[in-house]
Amino acid sequence: AMDTSEFQRLDKIRQLGGSSFVFPSATHTRKEHSVGTAHLALLVVRHLRNAQPELAIDDTDELCVGLAALLHDVGHGPYSHMWEPFVRRCTGDDSYSHEGMGARLVRRICTQIKLQEYIPEASVEFICACIEGLSDDAEWPFSHLSEDKRFLCDIVSNKRSGLDVDKWDYLNRDSVSTLGESSSGGFDVTRLVSAIRVVRGPSRCVGEVAFEEKVALDLNRIFKLRSEMHQMVYQHRVAIVAEAMITDAFLAASESEFRITATSEDGTSREFTLGEAASDCGAFTQLRDGLLETLQTSSASGLERTRQILERLNRREFYQEVGRGAILPTKPLCSECSSETEPRDRFCSQCGASTESRRWDLARRFENNDGRECTVVKPQLLSLSKEDCRRAILDRVEGDSVEEDDVLVGITDIKYGWGYQVPDAHHDRLSWQVRDPLAHVLFFNPKDDVERGYHIPSGKLSQLALPKSTHERVLYCYYRGDPSNTAALRALTEAYERYTKSLPGASAAGRSNPTPSPFARKRRMSGDGPPLPVLDRSGGRTLDMDDCLPPAKRYRDKF
């Protein structure tokens, strides 16, 4: 499977996409991550095979899980996750995903290497299921395989708890590549593998992956690292803008006469637009990160807009940020003072008003064990989309200096853990959708019952290990147009600020970089005359620049 063009192209696709514009060392590829994930998956399968012979894991099971881990990312396009929103906007296909394309490529690879000669043909679909994962309420789709093997689908992509070897590899690999080993806050994978066992849950008849209770804090560290990586790396505002510019360049190229010549799925050689190539397995294998350089040097007509964007990107002239980011509330808001409240609060801690009439949006409805219908809700502003915000900002722009296509809105969405339901303080059939890192993780005690697992309530963990908030959303607005157009920038800034002030519970986000020292703007280069005097605003005394040095250095320089 590794010796195919579908897999080898991953060596030309960076794992972190636009993050390399912020972290120059973030140049590792999807191929490295895929090999690492396959290694970890085989470690887990072999550990379970040796520790629990009763699971009847055979060579075919081990091969399927290993191939699923190795091929789980073959559906990624240029610049990884950025490719999917481009294809959706270009083709209008909102269902397009790298998982769907990956499943098609996996079937193509299995046909090329004649895998059906070694394992049952139905096992190819099992490999795809291991890549996509099975949700807790999904039916078991395979007749050739006992449902007792359902736990195998949790190893590569765990839809129950979110703890899988894919996440273990990319978090450790990405954090070391961007933040460095000393500050990455990594975790010991070998300790986690040795703590795995397949047990039955409290209300299930088939086994699922569980962990020894002693590694609960280690698992919490994984979710903590994930949220930190999203905040500092994956959803860094510069990385988001860089990827937005690349997306705009691809969209402009898709409207030009630029074509990719490739052999299609049916074996014929023809030309494809970028949108067409994204949906054809044959042409898709020709798409790599080098597509940007190809666009810059192509002689196809209609690429002027694409080259203009890429030239700005190369000069790091990113789209202009408008105003300051606005932190959007993620908890229920008090109907009186718009302060955030906890789902179980009966009264607002700020104004003392009752929380009975808090505003919400419907998340889902379901029937509980006694047949009663229950409603799961979420705070109202959690339903706010980027397009909703963009339209609202444009409606508040005064004059005609701002073009509609010049406004770009981004919302960073950082979650700490998996979602679960908390009952409302006033209504017994109403539950709020909140997040808890270990709510869906199954644990066992090797000194007690190794057949039945259990869940650990968040209150049992050390409160030092739990964050004050488990969900953060920040709204940003950018101007795509000419940054020298001060009239448009001023009009857009005023409209954006009016909009953020109208959002209940929203607050200004901090800057990514510290505010520069007032002294830094007045210093001269060394040897460029005497130091400039600086006014001490607190006492009115005129200071020399040497007074800004630490006392130890000031004392040393005198002698």
Language-model features: locations:
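Cys/His-rich microdomains that often coordinate metals
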Residues: 341-343, 355-357
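Residues immediately within or flanking Cys/His clusters that coordinate Zn2+
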Residues: 331, 345
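Terminal helices and disordered tails flanking the catalytic cores of nucleotide-processing hydrolases
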Residues: 233, 257-330, 352, 358-559
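Generic recognition of long tandem-repeat/solenoid scaffolds
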Residues: 1, 206-211, 334, 439-445
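Sequence-structural signature of the catalytic-core scaffold of metal-dependent phosphohydrolases
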Residues: 1-67, 75-329, 362-372, 378
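A composition/biophysics-driven feature that prefers long, compositionally simple stretches
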Residues: 221, 341, 456-460
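Short cysteine-rich clusters marking metal-coordination/redox-active sites
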Residues: 334-337, 348-351
